[in-house]
UniProtKB/Swiss-Prot annotation:
This is Acetyl-coenzyme A carboxylase carboxyl transferase subunit beta. GO terms for biological process: fatty acid biosynthetic process; malonyl-CoA biosynthetic process. It comes from Clostridium botulinum (strain 657 / Type Ba4). Keywords: ATP-binding, Cytoplasm, Fatty acid biosynthesis, Fatty acid metabolism, Lipid biosynthesis, Lipid metabolism, Metal-binding, Nucleotide-binding, Transferase, Zinc, Zinc-finger. InterPro entries: AcCoA_carboxyl_beta (IPR034733), Acetyl_CoA_COase_Trfase_b_su (IPR000438), ClpP/crotonase-like_dom_sf (IPR029045), COA_CT_N (IPR011762), Znf-ACC (IPR041010). GO terms for cellular component: acetyl-CoA carboxylase complex. GO terms for molecular function: acetyl-CoA carboxylase activity; ATP binding; carboxyl- or carbamoyltransferase activity; zinc ion binding. Belongs to the AccD/PCCB family.
Length: 289
């Protein structure tokens, strides 16, 4: 009996790898992208519910940034949108180092050809020409192709006698294209001047963020200027302005609510109401088409 008392105890060795495998096999898995955290209130939101609510937080009303494809889905009558000029190719006129590779990588990641999608479609049965900028493609920066596509869309709107709607979201001019990028400000503005001469309607919808050269040109030229709630809209950054004038700016400076209060825009429209409001505005002006 004493002999059995001092006998070595039998045991099983479990490696760290076996423990990790056990945890992996027995831990419930949640598919990627099923839940999203609101970056304003911190609420964890179910992705499907968020999409049904136009990518707007149902707790705090925060408008998530959305791309061109989502806007087309929310805006147009089903299967009426026809894209234009998607084959226009971005060049590297200044031979900016790494620019070609960056463009190709972004194209693969986003499945977008450039930072703006243009075309025509129907809103409540009424045909319109639309240009939708997308922040996923180099933060919606305005290069020569962006300016060219928007200009072509405006020129076609004149030919077809249709109103133009532009959704803006941009970090400004694309630095990799230098002065050619800045030239697009005048180019698009000139096309809009011709649209105005023809008596056709131009509605601009400002989304978060709309800054730099886009703000300084076609974003502020609309006959009617709308904006989404809490959108950042301005030219230079807030800190740059504060350092320049040596003054502290209001907390809501450059927000769409601040711009509405000071007469820079006409109306703030929640995303869920945007299609209805645009349809009403187009219908009010349809005699000019």
């Amino acid at each position: 009996m004493l002999k059995n008392l001092f006998r070595k105890t039998k045991y099983i060795t479990v490696s760290q790898k076996n423990i990790e495998n056990y945890k992996r096999e027995n831990t419930p898995t949640i598919p990627d992208g099923m839940w999203v955290k609101c970056n304003k209130c911190g609420e964890i939101l179910y992705q499907n519910d968020l999409e049904k609510n136009y990518m707007v937080c149902n707790l705090c009303g925060n408008h998530f940034r959305i791309g061109a494809k989502e806007r087309i889905k929310y805006l147009f009558d089903k299967d009426t949108f026809k894209e234009w000029d998607y084959k226009v190719k971005t060049e590297n006129p200044l031979n900016f180092k790494g620019y070609d590779e960056k463009i190709e990588n972004i194209k693969e990641e986003t499945n977008l050809s450039e930072a703006v999608t243009t075309g025509k479609g129907k809103i409540a049965g009424m045909e319109v020409v639309v240009c939708i900028m997308d922040s996923k493609f180099m933060m919606g920066s305005m290069g020569s192709v962006v300016g060219e596509k928007i200009t072509r869309a405006i020129e076609r709107a004149i030919e077809l006698r249709m109103p133009v709607i532009i959704f803006t979201v941009s970090g400004g001019a694309r630095m990799q294209e230098g002065i050619l990028s800045l030239m697009q400000m005048a180019k698009v503005s000139s096309a809009l001047a011709k649209l105005d001469e023809e008596g056709l309607l131009y509605i601009c919808v400002l989304t978060d963020p709309t800054t730099g050269g886009v703000t300084a040109s076609f974003a502020m030229l609309g006959d009617i200027i709308l904006a989404e709630p809490d959108a950042l809209i301005g030219f230079a950054g807030k800190r740059v302005i504060e350092q320049t004038i040596n003054e502290k700016l209001p907390e809501d400076f450059q927000k769409s609510e601040f711009l509405l209060e000071h007469g820079f825009i006409d109306k703030i429209v929640p995303r869920s109401d945007l299609r209805k409001v645009l349809a009403k505005l187009i219908n009010m002006h349809k005699n000019s088409f």
